[in-house]
UniProtKB/Swiss-Prot annotation:
It is found in: Cell membrane. The keyword Repressor does not apply. Residues 145-155 have a biased composition (Low complexity). Residues 1-20, 78-187, 201-309 are annotated as: Disordered. Residues 201-210, 255-264 have a biased composition (Basic and acidic residues). It comes from the Eukaryota. Residues 81-90, 110-126 have a biased composition (Pro residues). This is Protein ROLLING AND ERECT LEAF 2. GO terms for biological process: cell differentiation. One of its GO terms (cellular component) is plasma membrane.
Amino acid sequence: MGCTASKVEQEDTVRRCKERRRHMKEAVASRQQLASAHADYLRSLRLTAAALSRFAQGHPSLAVSHHTAPVLLTTAAPALAPTPTPPPPSSTASSSLPPPTPLLPKHQQAPPPPPPTQSHQPPPPVAVRAPRGGPRRLKVPHILSDSSVASPARSSFRKPVVGTPSSSSAWDWENFYPPSPPDSEFFDRRKADLEEANRLRELEEEEKARGYLHPHHLKEEDEVDDDDDEREEEMHCGGWEDDDDHYASTTTSETRSEEGEMGNRSECGFAARSEYGGTAPSEYAAAPLPLPLRRRDERSEAGDSSSTVTAAAEMRMVIRHRTLAEIVAAIEEYFVKAAEAGNGVSELLEASRAQLDRNFRQLKKTVYHSNSLLSSLSSTWTSKPPLAVRYKLDTNALEMESMEGKSHGSTLERLLAWEKKLYQEVKARESVKIEHEKKLSTLQSLEYRGRDSTKLDKTKASINKLQSLIIVTSQAATTTSSAIVRVRDNELAPQLVELCFALLSMWRSMNHFHEIQNEIVQQVRGLVDNSMAESTSDLHRLATRDLEAAVSAWHSNFNRLIKYQRDYIRALYGWLKLTLFQVDSNIPQEAYTSLISRELTTFCDEWKQALDRLPDASASEAIKSFVNVVHVIYTKQAEEMKIKKRTETYSKELEKKTNSLRAIEKKYYQSYSMVGLGLPGSGRDGIESHSFDARDPLAEKKTEIAQCRRKVEDEMTRHAKAVEVTRSMTLNNIQTGLPGMFQAIAGFSGTVVEALDVVCRRAGSVR
């Protein structure tokens, strides 16, 4: 029997199924360890931030030098979707365009754009955010005098349109786009708008002849503030009068002939274009800028002069922190953001307790109390301790869970159960086949020898029975294998792709936050210690110890995260590679495997190779070196505290001896200053005299006090030197260790993003 069992284990099919079971078992265990390591890594980021903040708060004297250059942070806004470039408007169309939208009022005007540079490129439109509560208006600058040769005349002509809280726009007549989107009445109003524009042009010409411009088309409530508005317009847009040459040079001849002054006087306006006309969303176009340096792409030279390309805006902020505590506070904020970036992966890996409890919804909990029977689907406990708690499987919850979709962990658990079942079935099938071969040999021997026919019939009956068992076991193995293939292709494949994309998103966000931290932390190179005499306290030492423990945990969890992720993908790849073979090895691979299985195997192979190529050793060494740096600081603080304690001990001893000497002097000499003088009544003829007594009984005690005082002074000198060494060591180690750690972790996260980006491109074929 043992020989038969060993022979079954040596079969290729059985060995392959055993390897599949082992790989899936490793994948399930690695997934659990990866979820735990991922949760611990996110937790260690928060703990490191808190410990670093407590450490920095204990060193308020570490200030940033005034000679240190500030940090320039560039935060790119989300890129806007490219908008299609419409064809340039024809002359007839431009002459019958609808009126432009109203602009912002004077009290909520956006700051004017900077003056154009010396280049001859047209300036980009400046987007502003409209207020809540209704449309706004803004007066454009007064027209220039006719004596200006380089610029055509301008007017403060206004036209009303509807403004929304999210966006507002004014027409840029040099590069005109139709409104977005035109309503059904657009073409009906074209003729009326053209007539209105001609009438207003005639009125403006009459007013220009009188030397001033009066806005006839404004509402009555706006006429009261015309004088104040005009004064503010001159202050707000006065710097634009020098740019008329530049603005006039960008106007095409067709626009100048058809629109005339209407195109020129709208050049001062602010434009925010929509999807059809290029309107940017208000949250991107009018983001608050402490130091506003917005950059837009130049106008496209490949298209017509009326087509523009607006790129995603970038916000640059110049940051200067004053102390180490402020630097660490800024770093702590991005530590928290980096930890929050991993929540999506935690959901997929089921790393939180809430997700673990969610998997037990199919269990109905019954709590037995002394006075009542409470039945609830939730796991909420009552205030009284129960007598007994029993769980029962709820089939309705199982059906609901199957309809909602399985989690990644449950998918792997079911695959492991299927693999165990498949291994037993294949093993049983192969053992039946071996027994069948033995019976065939026996039958052949009996027929050859011509023995008793009864034995021959029994052997044939056994062979028929074994053949039936072979068919049944083969069908069972085929059914189980088909179930595994179905779960692999329909559930596991999309879950792995989703996990890969979630990891890419997490590391991309972490890389962004670590890059900002790396920029901010460069300021520690300019730290100076304004108080070198400040000694270390117990709170400082505890904060340093907590920082060392937190960074050490970060280092350990970082290594665990990378290790278990590699183990997980390696186990999955090994299992997927074996699933490409049919349970029955006689069938060729191409006839069995599907396209999605081959693509999924290739996808996991590239994922495994990308993880193997990651330079995690450099990042791990950088974090470990910072742990060593903090440990050195902690050691120096311990030495300083030891010297301080010894100094305090000697000081107490000196104080004790001094007090004892003063007590003796007070008792026997009745004075603190009679030491070394004669005793009372020792003079001749009973005359009191104070002569020096060479036989001072307290000379020995005074000598001891002098020696103790010298010890105290020596220890105080050592303590002062130890304080200076500790402060200097702390400053130097922070300046060298902290930037190196953030530089390494930022570089590693960037490498992970590049590697996973290549892997995710391969995921398209898996989907």
